[in-house]
Amino acid sequence: MVKVRKSMIKDIKSVLKDLNQHKYIYVLRISILQFLMTTIGAYLLALLLKVVLINSNIPGMTTDNLLSFLTNPLTLGLLFVYLLLLAFLIYLEFSLLVEIIECKEAKLGVGLFYFKERSRHFFKSISGWHFLAFLFYLILTIPFIEFLVSSALLENLYIPNFISGELLKSTNGKIIYFGLYAIFAYFNLRFIYALPLAVTKKDNRFAVALKESWWLTRGTKIFRVLGFASVILIIVAIISLLSATGIGLAALVDGSEKTFWVETLFLSFVWGVLFAGRLVFKLAFLSYLLKGFDPKTPQKLPIRENKKQHRMLALTGLLLLIGGINFTYNTFKASSDPSKNLAVIGHRGMLSQGVENSLESLEASAKAGASYSELDIILSKDGHFIVSHDDNLKRLTGKNITISQSQAKDILGLKIKQNGYESHLVSFEDYVAKAKQLGIKLLVELKPTGNEPDNYEQLFVDKMKELHVDSSYLVMSADLKTIEKVKRLDSAIQSGHTISSQLGDFTSQKVNFYAIEDFSYNELLARKAHQNGKKIYVWTINSRDDIERYLETSTDSIITDYPTSVREIEKELAADDSYLDYFLRLTNLSWIEKL
C-alpha cells in the first residue's frame, strides 16, 4: 500500500508538471480534436443514422417501431455499420489524445499513413467477438461518463430518467438501482485502463485489454485510480476561480439587469471555462492512466522555434473559429425567448402528497396549481376503465392481481400503499368526478396491455363523451396505433404520443402533441413540432436543475412529480436573476444555494 501511495504521488506531480509546462499546446490541440469530433464525427454519424432510417421507411425510431426496425435485415446491417463507425471514431479520438500527450510540443505525425495504421490496428483490435466486448465496455461506462475519460461523442449520453425514476419509487427498486450502480462502479474501476491499453498496445485485442486492465487494478492497486481525486480538486478550484472572476466582471459591468451583449459574452465565457476544464480533466486523467502501465513510448523531439510560432498562430486561429461559433450560438441563445405560459402537469397526481393515481394525489396536484393532472387507465376484463399505471397490482397492493384479467368489482376499492401513504383503487368515472369537483383538467394516458377487445378505442371514446370531457381533456398513449385510432374516431379529442426514447424525427403527424422523455428532448425537435402546429411536453422533470433548464426552453409543458416546486422555481427565477444565479443554473449547481 505504501508503495502504491508513493507511486501515485509521484505520478500526480509528474502529470501536473507536464500540464503546466505544455498547457497552451495541449488545450489548443485538444480543442481542435474536440471540435472535429463533435462536428465532422457527429455529422457522419447523423448522416449514417439518416440513411438507416430512410432504408427502414420510418422518420424516427421509437419503442413503437423498434421490433420492425430490428427485423429488417438491411437496417440491421446499416445499424452494425453505424456502431462500427462510432467505435472507430472513439478509438481514433483516444489514439489522437495519446499522440498529443506523447508529442507535447513536437509535430503531430497524423498524416495519411497514421490514419491507415490506426484503421488497421482498430479492425484487428475489435475483430470477431472482440467487437461485442468493445460495445459491452461502452455500455458499462454510460452511468459514469461524466466522471471518466469519455469520448466527445458520448458526453451527453446518460441513463434515461424514466428508467431510474421508476426503480427509485419502491424499496426493492432502490436496492436494485443502487446495487447495480455499485456493481457498475466496481467494473468501471477494474476496466479503467482498457481503452488506453487498446490504443497504445497496437497488437492487443480489446478483450485482452480488458483482461490486462483487470490485472492492473487487482488488490491495493485499485486505490491508485482513486488517487486522481486530488488532481480533480485542483482543476475544480481553478475553474471555480475563473468562474468567480467572470461572474464578478459581468455583474460589475451590467449591474442588476442583464443586457443582451453582456449576457452573450457571459454565456461564451462560461462555455469556454467549462470547455477548457473538461479538456484539461480528460488530458490529465488519460496521462495519469498511461503512467499506470508505462508504455515506455519515447518522447518525440521538439520542433524548431520558428515552426512552433507558425503552428501556434495557426492553432490560435482555429481556436478563435471555435470561439466564434460558440459566440454565435450564445447570441442566438441569449436572444431566444423561453416558453411563455408553461403548463405544469402533475405526474400521476402529486406523489409527494399521496399514492400515485389516487384521489388524494389528484387533490394535492390541484392545490399545487397544476394546469393538468396526469393519470393512467387500464381496461378490466369486463370493460371498465381502472385508474392505475401497472396492469399487475403487486407493486402498490402487495397482491398478484392483473387488472386486464380481473372483474372491476374484484379490484375497485383495493387498498394501495406508497411512500407511507394509503388510498384505494378507483374507477375512471370516480376520478373524473373528483377532478371536476376540484376544478382541474386531466391528461389521460391509455395503457393497453394486449388483452383489450377490438373495440377498445371506441369504448374509450364513448366513455369520454359520456363523461362530457372529450373536448376538454388531453389524451395520450405510448401505443401509436391506439392514439391515432382514438383521434380518428373523435377528432375533437386532443391526442398525444407518449415517447420514452426516440432517434430521428417524430413518427406521427396525426396527433396534437408529443410527450417526450427528457433523454430524447432537444430544442431542434421542439422547433420542428411547433413549425408543424404541434405542442411538445417533456417528462418526468423532477430535479431543481432540470426544472430550471426546461423553464428556459420552448417546451409547452413540464410533466413532474412536484408541481409545487415548478411554480415556486418560476417565481424565484422571476424575482432573483443575478449572474451568480445564472451561472449556477447553467452549470446545474443551483442546489448549492439551498445548502
Please report, for each region that a protein language model flagged, where it lies by residue:
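Conserved, mostly hydrophobic/aromatic
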Residues: 347, 365, 376, 411, ...
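A cross-domain feature marking catalytic cores of carbohydrate-active enzymes
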Residues: 348, 375-377, 446, 477, ...
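Hydrophobic alpha-helical membrane segments
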Residues: 1-344
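Loop/turn elements at helix/coil->beta-strand transitions in domains of secreted/extracellular proteins
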Residues: 124-125, 222-225, 437-441, 469-472, ...
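Membrane-interface segments at or immediately adjacent to transmembrane helices
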Residues: 331-382, 386-387, 394-396, 401-405, ...
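Metal-dependent phosphodiesterase/phospholipase catalytic core, i.e.
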Residues: 389-493, 586-594
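Structural preference for beta-strand elements that scaffold enzyme active sites
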Residues: 341-345, 372, 439-443, 472-474, ...
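C-terminal active-site rim and adjoining tail of enzyme catalytic domains
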Residues: 226, 497-499, 504-595
